[in-house]
Amino acid sequence: MQKPLKLTFIADTHHYSKTLGTSGRQYELRSGSDQKCLAETGEIIDAAFEKIANSDTDFVLIAGDVSNDGELVSHIEFKKKLDRLAKKKKIYLITATHDWCCDENPRKFDGDTVSNDVETMPSFKLYPFYEEYTINDAIAKYETHLGTYSYVVQLSDKVRLLALNDDQNGKGRAGFKPKHFEWIDEQLKKAKDDGCLMIGMEHHLLIPHINPLITGGGTCVGDREEVITRLADNGLRYMFVGHSHIQHTDDYTTPSGNKLTEVNIGSLVGYPAPIVNVTVNDDMTLSYTVEHLEKFTLNGRETDAQPFLAKHCTDLVHNVLSCRDKEEFAARITALQANGGAVAKFFFAIKPLLKFVDGATVGEMYKKLKHLGLARGIDKEAVHEFYNTKITDFIDRLLLSAIDGSVVKYDRNSAYYRLVMSIVSIPSKLLKSNTDMKRLIFTADTILTGGKYNNQNETI
């Protein structure tokens, strides 16, 4: 009996060279504003690659954003890591917009200063640079207007990988230009004619996972329903993507009844450092299991990955909540890529709220809501159970659940679920005509329960 084909997917390694700076005020602001790590990426990638090298997987597939911001030095260092892994495993990857710094804002940090004087890798040099991990083995390839490539490789007699570069669709969004899409159509038809299962991999999402409030807009390809319908109706059943840094599985069924299932892979260098192991079954279904990196070596010491990464993730919220100074608040908001100066104009009103949320318990929050006449509908029994729990503990748990694909699931009858949902429902009651407020309820439900699929272990 033939051995099942085994694939390992990872995404968003965002390797950052330490030569670009790892200390100082500006670095701290940048590092503290992101769910994923920065200076620690090299050590995390090394540990993950060692784990994968010792596994029984046949192929390692990387879904884009391999570098932090396209810095040449980061690419050079990352390729050396690939070369070491390649001694034991076959690797295929795609690049994405961070790999050629599409926003033209590469940075290096030195104390209180940040500089853009950083050499980056232009898009047209990416695929020659990563040639042995991309188009060398391609049975078909397509060069985009950026000089990047989509390509097809034969993974086994009956399985092919459709590796798609979706950086630009020519209309200001991620996706594919018309001729590019025609090439994709041809490859899907050829795979069907040859009796092969085609597994897709691209960087941007086809489906707004969890809810469009979280992964809509620029997180997805442009004209996403048109794109996913065309792919599914032409025979593509599975797509693996990155970009959102969220671990989540969802599907879409076209008006013609064709279903495409998409697995969104979280960032390898952020909580919970997911490694998605996939087995291709005899009936051409896919079974996946998500592993999380347990340990990595940092500054010569073995570090427990999960608490370290979870703290780094939740700190981006705590860094804002702990602001008691207008200038610090503006700097933190700016680091989150928002207009800190404009928001800080209202700091006089925001500061008391930050202070309250940062220190208050569920019981104190309930009293405050009751005083404001907003406690109607809050589950009192659930409040009592979590009366002395800090609000920030709830925020942390929700954030981590959104990112890790609900490793911990909450029953809809549990006190935790009832309390969160009754609080989340308050804005929709105040703004009854606001669609986004109603979406917030469905978003919270998906985060707490995990949604339609088991995001950690499932056959699709």
PLM regions with names:
Residues 16-19, 68-71, 97-105, 169-172, ...:
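Active-site environment of divalent metal-dependent phosphoester hydrolases
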Residues 77-182, 256, 277, 286:
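Extended active-site neighborhood of metal-dependent phosphoesterases/phosphodiesterases
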Residues 9-11, 59-65, 90-97, 199-203, ...:
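Active-site neighborhood of phospho(di)ester-bond hydrolases with catalytic His/Asp-centered motifs
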Residues 33-34, 168-182, 191-238:
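Active-site-proximal segments of metal-dependent phosphoesterases and phosphodiesterases across multiple
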Residues 1-75:
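N-terminal active-site segment of His-dependent metallophosphoesterases
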Residues 11-43, 107-111, 170-176, 212-216, ...:
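Acidic/histidine-rich helix-loop elements
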Residues 216-294:
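Conserved beta-sheet core of the metallophosphoesterase superfamily
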Residues 1-2, 298-460:
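Non-catalytic terminal accessory segments
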